[in-house]
UniProtKB/Swiss-Prot annotation:
Pfam families: CTP_synth_N, GATase. The active site is at residues 383, 520, 522. Pathway: Pyrimidine metabolism; CTP biosynthesis via de novo pathway; CTP from UDP: step 2/2. The gene is pyrG. HAMAP family: PyrG (MF_01227). Its EC number is 6.3.4.2. The keyword DNA repair does not apply. Keywords: ATP-binding, Glutamine amidotransferase, Ligase, Magnesium, Metal-binding, Nucleotide-binding, Pyrimidine biosynthesis. This is CTP synthase. It comes from Albidiferax ferrireducens (strain ATCC BAA-621 / DSM 15236 / T118) (Rhodoferax ferrireducens). UTP binds at residues 13, 191-196, 227. Residues 295-547 form the Glutamine amidotransferase type-1 domain.
Amino acid sequence: MTKFVFVTGGVVSSLGKGIASASLAAILESRGLKVTLIKLDPYLNVDPGTMSPFQHGEVFVTNDGAETDLDLGHYERFVETRMRKANNFTTGQIYKSVLEKERRGDYLGKTVQVIPHVTNEIQDFVKRGAGWGTPDAVDVAIVEIGGTVGDIESLPFLEAVRQMSLKLGPNNSAFVHLSYVPWIAAAGELKTKPTQHTAKQLREIGIQADALLCRADRPIPKEEREKISLFSNVPDWAVISMWDVDTIYKVPRMLHEQGLDGLICDKLRLSTPPANLKRWDDLVYETAHPQGDVNIVMVGKYVELSDSYKSLNEAIRHAGMKNHVRVKIDYIDSETITPDNVTQLAKFDAILVPGGFGIRGVEGKICAARFARENKVPYLGICLGMQVATIEFARHVAGLKDANSTEFDPSSPNPVIALITEWKDADGSIKTRDENSDLGGTMRLGAQSSDVVKGTLAHKIYGDVVTERHRHRYEANVHFLDTLRKAGLVISAFTQREHLTEIVELPQSVHPWFMGVQFHPEFNSTPWAGHPLFIAFIKAALDHQAAGKALKAVA
């Protein structure tokens, strides 16, 4: 039977529940257990797909086309299990499901209430995410509850997991609570009172934590941990210090050395081999011992919040490790880039233009793509980054004056990028939309395969077929492809059903490394394997750097 670990948070948000949950899952997986993770988000949005990146950060897309919380990206990078739609749900989804059941008459005329109907629905969703009662059932499901204890929004979730723990019976569930222990500089000490209070709030709800993870900017001394233990009704050996580290890949070892996985296995009566964290140790060693540095610039619309590009940042770092270098990423707001100042990009070894929505900052991205093309700087455009590269090429090489996307200029005489009206979804179903369709849930989403043209840079990287995850509404307009090809643009991958453009590039005889992809390869990168596209991109940046040094040496 599947056992559950419920992870809650207190005092403040953004303490790292996702990293803590993923790290615990990684340790349990190293013990030979089949593990999955589920994220419960207490907001009323059906999913984060229409939320601003400045508010929510990145929207992580699963293979089956779910737009989910960025924590699912952490989960996939830490464990072998691939996340699905069932691994993330929101209050909006819960209420939507409950109201649909009420309309169908499923409740047989009863008054529909938060308890038991909403709480039962939450429990059903959690079990579905764990594959409960199916051949896909896991040994342990780690359930992360978003928000903080004390929030009104979180109460139905906390009540649901309290009830679920009771129904599961002894030794089938455990509670891990993450709290904050601030360092007060004026007093010169760590303060445990916030953690004492949040543990008390949790008990008032009816939940007793089995382990407390105490976040601080430094290791918490034994005396403070004993004090927390006394006032939180948690054994001192279950009060675990979680301090700031220079890489998140140190966290599994940190938690293991303090016995968190042993505590959980004892609580759940799980008999397993010892944890084997060698690959984590090797990973940390690799990050700490680079053989060089490479500098890339990301020209984006949401650079004020680095979480907006979380998976992309990680994918670049993974590729750096595979090339044995440390990648330094500079972020430049595309709104600030103009033809007059675009030469500031010359100091970088490569240029990356990520995805985005809306017209703001687009001309700056087009300037960046033009600079990379004309100055033979390695360029990788992702989603919108591929589209702006296509627009730039159309304007300045193919002679299509005023070329644009219908997203930015619906009346453009040369709409080289246009709205997709029909496509095959990740589940194989045919989807349609038009300009009047809702924004939410109407994009081309999830993993889809494309055929790669032989003799191209894309084929060197991917081989015959590329399967990547998508999240977009607009595509290269098929009516302009012949014109673009004749001007020298290489269309190196097409979708298998609709023959939509998936990858564009320049011939290596013209540019050493210039590529735009319509999909989001960052969602498939892991610290163990990296990702072939990003590995090739960083290698190109290194080659560009070496060529620049050689020119300076000659001069």
